[in-house]
Swiss-Prot record:
Residues 574-844 form a coiled coil. Pfam families: eIF3a_PCI_TPR-like (PF22591). This is Eukaryotic translation initiation factor 3 subunit A. Its main location: cytoplasm. Belongs to the eIF-3 subunit A family. The keyword RNA-binding applies. The gene is egl-45. Residues 1080-1098 have a biased composition (Low complexity). Residues 608-648, 805-857, 877-895, 916-978, 1054-1079 have a biased composition (Basic and acidic residues). Gene3D superfamilies: 1.25.40.860, UVR domain. GO terms for biological process: egg-laying behavior; embryo development ending in birth or egg hatching; formation of cytoplasmic translation initiation complex; translation reinitiation. Component of the eukaryotic translation initiation factor 3 (eIF-3) complex. One of its GO terms (cellular component) is eukaryotic 48S preinitiation complex. GO terms for molecular function: mRNA binding; translation initiation factor activity.
């Protein structure tokens, strides 16, 4: 933890030296580290550099890597704008110390192992036991003890320094120097894992440079990829990386490093073609050829060497004859060692249908060699012949080229190649011997297949002397497998047969089978083979003819030479003048080109100087602006500090307030100190207002939300259950399959156990049967005697049981006859009892059509028992004027509460359209005699039956489609909140014809149902059963069918027949019970049936 006081850098350095002298290096390191991290003095001085050097020495001595990293990053921020050279000095000194300590640790480890104790005394038991248990040598154990910590420290130092200096153009040279030292460290100590991490780290740094290349305000000192110096440094570092990977034999990392080098060269070439030197390309192709050779890719190895030879050939000044011969020989040997079909996909790729992957890999490798297309052996040979590689190669390579490419001698080619290969002595050429032997063997085998249909195995061994029997047989099989030749080994005849056959691997599956004259090589018979043989025969015959006519041809040649001499003498002067003119013209062209080139160079140098001057001026301007900006920020920071201090004082004074105490408890003291007091009050006020509004809104919505909460939970539960169901359905097949597999395994195991048990019991059974037979034979006489006795006893038992069975059947028949007689007598007595009871019932007074009287607790009339006590009659409702109920004023709601949708949707009861009378065809639908009855309807059945000659007050609408109607349809005050709608009744007609009575039809027109009631239960929301056929859908549910009659003239109800006069007192109790203060129990919406159930009684 940093101290609460500050020391000057000079005092801190002096204090650290004093602590070091007394042996307190850790305290000295803390003192110097606190000084580096202090924010008081951010201006660099030479004392800071001395402090950093001492700090690095202490970090190395104490192995404090994290403190060194922190101090270096702090020092970078201090010296970035002022003195970057000081940072480089500190970093170099730090790495030098770490490397020196690592070397000392290595020497110390070796010396400790070399120290030998008493020669007369052998190894102590502890040392022997340690060697056996660890399984490592003494040097390895000592390296892990002494050297490993310093290796880890040095690796962390390299990595931290690279992270410190990345993407900084001012220290780019030091960055690449440290990178190369890191590669040397990995190579010297064979740190393969660290080498891979280092390569990944450098790739990540390059990606970051490319990412932030054009990003604004990221880093003013970032590396620019347009700089040739930066690109050259990166390219050289990648070449060192590739060389290190090859030396460490990390071929996978070598291939990745080759890709990195190729990417850097492409990037440099895009920026400036002159950036990449030819020597860099030569080194790159040389390393890449080695990587391809180690990977076993002979084709791209030869292509890389050919590219290297082309670069060498362009460098005419530094390319001597010896170097040209050496490079050409190597290129030609590498090309000749390419096996057949190396550019084609393997059989495995064709069988797995991944040929596109092979093509993509070939294209990628071709890009690494800067080739437009994938190379082939034929293409490489043609390119080598074009640039004169065979002519420039050595004699050995020339002889091999002639033998393998332009020679048809199947019986001698392998021996001739072997004799040439024996002359190769150079180590870099000996690596191609094995490949050349394989190519020569395949070549000989192909040429032999042209001449012979079958050849003995002994002769094949003499023709191809490179291999023993097993290797030669493998060669023949591989050649046939890869469609190079069509051959089969006949071990019975001890020979090799050539040609297509179903028994060969190549027979019947190759695309070349349909081609005429398949041979696998253009030197074999076929169309192309015949042409080549004819050409060779013509050449040899022409040579023979020239030898026979040599004298004649000599005279013709001499005459031709004399003609050339005569022509030369005649045109000599003209040709000499033409040659001189051409030479002078070339010299003038060269002088003009050099002059233009010098002028362009001077112009470029002038422009470069101007750009550098402009850059320096821009840099100075930027530094001035940066200094001004720093000064402005410093003053602004001071002002902000003063304001914060004033604010803290104010907050400290107001902390005793209750509001502030609550805020402190809620947000914490630290956050409270950074807040504005007025802002705190404003936030507190807004929060209280928001809480109050939220509480009010919650109270208002609580009533709505409460009813839908359970429904929402059910909906969510349905979704969850559906998801679980789908999951179980998806899992069911797999579980079933697992269960079936386990069951089958169990059944198989059980079956095996049963089979095993059955075999055991079968053996026991056979032994038992044998034993039984033996016993039978031994006791035959005794057995026969016992059998005869048993038969006698059996006959006696059979006779006794037959007698018992006959007696039992006789008793059963007697009992059955007695039971039938008793049942017939009981049936007769029951019939007599029923007849007697029928006579008694007929003599009783009939009850009529009325049913049994309903119990008091189930009847509203029975509950109101005033009429039983001879109490004065009460009116069920106050008398009202005879007017349509829709003409009255709307009734005000009796309480204020939010109305629901069911309360406001009254279109089905308060409709403005008057109700029509149904058609006469459905006249029975409006009777109340055929519907379901209540239990007490039999009491007033004769009194309340409607007459058929009654007519409704809307008979003028009989010509239109009818619908049922009740008084509730015309009453506007039956429901609270209903909208007042006035209906104007049409004029009544006197002589309106009455409808003819028709029998009701089962398939007549449907009853009218208002839209608001469709798909809903009747009663406006209450769960009630639908009305029966013939019942009015708008009738109150507390009245039985047939109870209500149509209104008479004037809008009043007509009194039913056999009733007392309308104006007189009535002793009939109300069927709906006395009126209560609460809503009617039979209403659809708590008061829907009041008007309809009471007006008719007036």
């Amino acid at each position: 933890m940093a101290p609460n006081y500050f020391q000057k850098p000079e005092a801190a350095l002096k204090r650290a030296e004093e602590l070091i002298q007394v042996g307190k290096e850790s305290d000295a390191l803390d003192t110097l580290h606190d000084t580096i991290k202090a924010r008081r003095h951010k201006q660099w001085t030479t004392v800071h550099e001395q402090i950093m050097i001492k700090h690095m020495e202490l970090c190395v001595d104490l192995k404090k890597q994290h403190l060194a990293k922190d101090a270096l990053f702090q020092y970078k921020a201090l010296t970035q704008q002022i003195n970057v050279k000081s940072l480089e000095t500190v970093v170099e000194h730090f790495l030098k110390l770490a490397e020196q300590r690592t070397e000392d640790a290595q020497k110390q480890s070796i010396e400790k192992v070399e120290e030998i104790g008493d020669l007369d005394q052998g190894d102590v038991p502890e040392r022997l036991l340690l060697a056996v248990v660890s399984g490592a040598a003494a040097q390895d154990r000592m390296d892990r003890t002494v050297l490993a910590p310093w290796l880890r420290f040095l690796w962390d130092s390299y990595r931290n320094c690279l992270e410190l200096l990345r993407n900084n153009a001012q220290v780019e040279q030091l960055y690449h120097t440290i990178s190369r030292h890191s590669f040397s460290f990995c190579l010297r100590y064979q740190r393969r894992t660290e080498f891979r991490k280092l390569c990944d780290l450098l790739r990540m740094h390059l990606n970051q440079i490319q990412k932030h290349q054009y990003a604004p305000n990221v880093n003013s000192f970032r590396v620019k990829l347009t700089s040739p110096e930066s690109l050259t440094l990166m390219q050289d570092t990648r070449l060192v990386q590739l060389d290190t990977a090859i030396q460490m034999e990390l071929w996978q990392e070598a291939y990745k490093s080759a890709e990195d080098v190729h990417g850097m060269m492409q990037l440099s070439k895009d920026k400036d073609k002159r950036t990449v030197k030819p020597s860099s390309y030569v080194n790159y192709y040389d390393k890449l050829a080695l990587v391809f050779w180690k990977a076993g890719n002979r084709l791209f190895h030869a292509a890389a060497l050919l590219q290297k030879f082309i670069i060498y050939k362009d460098m005419k000044k530094s390319f001597t004859q010896e170097e040209a011969q050496e490079q050409a020989t190597r290129v030609l040997l590498a090309t000749l060692s390419i096996p057949e079909g190396s550019d084609l996909p393997s059989d495995l790729s064709r069988n797995l249908d991944i040929e596109e992957q092979h093509v993509a890999n070939m294209r990628l490798l071709s890009n690494l060699l800067r080739l437009p297309i994938a190379p082939t052996k034929v293409g490489i040979l043609k390119e080598a012949a074009r640039i004169g590689v065979p002519e420039a190669a050595g004699q050995v390579a020339k002889d091999l080229f002639k033998l393998l490419e332009s020679n048809f001698s199947p019986l001698r080619v392998a021996k001739d190649v072997q004799s040439v290969l024996d002359t190769i002595t150079r180590p870099d050429h000996l690596q191609y011997v094995e490949s050349l032997q394989a190519v020569a063997a395949v070549k000989a085998l192909k040429q032999v297949s042209v001449i012979y249909e079958a050849i003995s195995w002994e002769r094949i061994r003499k023709i191809i002397p490179f291999y023993h029997d097993l290797a030669l047989e493998r060669l023949v099989v591989e050649a046939s497998k890869h469609r190079i030749v069509k051959a089969q080994l006949d071990h019975r005849a001890d020979c090799v047969r050539f040609g297509s056959s179903d028994a060969t691997l190549a027979g019947g599956v190759d695309e070349y089978d349909n081609n005429e004259g398949f041979t696998g090589d253009d030197t074999q018979l076929g169309v192309e083979g015949v042409r080549n043989h004819l050409e060779a025969m013509y050449t040899r015959l022409r040579v023979l003819v020239e030898g026979l006519d040599s004298e004649k041809r000599r005279k013709e040649i001499v005459k031709k030479i004399e003609n050339h001499v005569t022509s030369y003498e005649k045109n000599r002067v003209t040709e000499i003048e033409r040659i001189h003119r051409r030479k002078k013209m070339l010299e003038n062209y060269k002088e003009n080109w050099e002059r233009v080139k010098a002028e362009k160079a001077a112009t470029a140098a002038t422009e470069q100087a101007k750009r550098e001057e402009a850059a320096r001026a821009e840099e100075m301007k930027r530094l001035d602006e940066q200094n001004k900006e720093s000064e402005r920020k410093r003053k602004q920071a001071e002002q902000e500090e003063i304001q914060k201090k004033i604010k803290r004082d104010q907050l400290h004074k107001m902390q005793q307030n209750v509001i502030y105490q609550a805020i402190i408890k809620e947000k914490g003291l630290e956050q409270f100190r950074d807040m504005d007091p007025e802002q705190v009050l404003r936030e507190q006020r807004e929060r209280l207002d928001k809480e109050r509004a939220e509480t009010q809104r919650r109270l208002q919505q609580q009533e709505k939300k409460f009813d839908h909460h359970i429904r929402a939970l059910h909906l969510e539960e349905m979704n969850e259950r559906r998801a679980v169901m789908h999951m179980r359905l998806n899992e069911a097949p797999r579980l079933h399959e697992e269960y079936e597999n386990k069951r089958i395994e169990k059944e198989i195991a059980a079956h095996e156990n049963h089979v095993k048990l059955w075999s055991m019991w079968d053996q026991v059974r056979e032994a038992t049967l044998d034993w039984v037979e033996t016993v039978k034979v031994e006791n035959q006489e005794n057995l026969e005697k016992k059998i005869s006795d048993w038969e006698v006893k059996l006959e006696a038992v059979r006779n006794s049981r037959l007698a018992e069975r006959a007696e039992k059947r006789k008793k059963e028949r007697k009992e059955a006859a007695m039971q039938a007689k008793i049942a017939e007598e009981r049936k007769r007595r029951e019939e007599e009892e029923r007849a007697r009871q029928a006579v008694i019932d007929s003599q009783r007074r009939p009850h009529g059509e009325r049913g049994q009287r309903r119990e008091m607790e189930n009847s509203a009339a029975m509950q109101d028992s005033d009429w039983r006590r001879n109490a004065p009659p009460r009116d069920s409702m106050p008398q009202r004027e005879p007017r349509p109920m829709r003409d009255g004023p709307p009734r005000e709601p009796f309480r204020e509460m939010p109305s629901s949708k069911a309360d406001t949707d009254s279109s089905w009861r308060s409709s403005a359209q008057p109700t029509r009378k149904p058609d006469d065809r459905r006249s029975d639908d409006f009777r109340r005699d055929d519907g379901p009855r209540r239990s007490d309807d039999h009491r007033r059945n004769d009194e309340f039956r409607r007459s058929d000659d009654f007519r409704r007050n809307d008979d003028f609408r009989r010509d239109g489609p009818p619908r049922p109607m009740s008084k509730a349809d015309t009453d506007q005050k039956w429901e609270r909140g209903a909208v007042t709608k006035t209906v104007v009744s049409p004029p009544k007609t006197e002589n309106q014809p009455a409808p003819a009575a028709e029998a009701p039809k089962a398939d007549g027109p449907r009853r009218f149902i208002p839209p608001a009631l469709r798909n809903k239960p009747a009663g406006g929301g209450d769960e009630q059963p639908a009305p029966q056929r013939g019942a009015n859908v708008t009738s109150p549910p507390d009245r039985a069918p047939g109870l209500r009659g149509p209104p008479g003239p004037g809008g009043r109800d007509l009194p039913p027949r056999d009733l007392p006069p309308r104006d007189g007192p009535r002793d009939i109790p109300r069927r709906d019970g006395p009126r209560r203060d609460g809503p009617n129990r039979n209403s659809g919406a708590n008061n829907a049936g009041n008007a309809d159930s009471a007006n008719w009684r007036r």
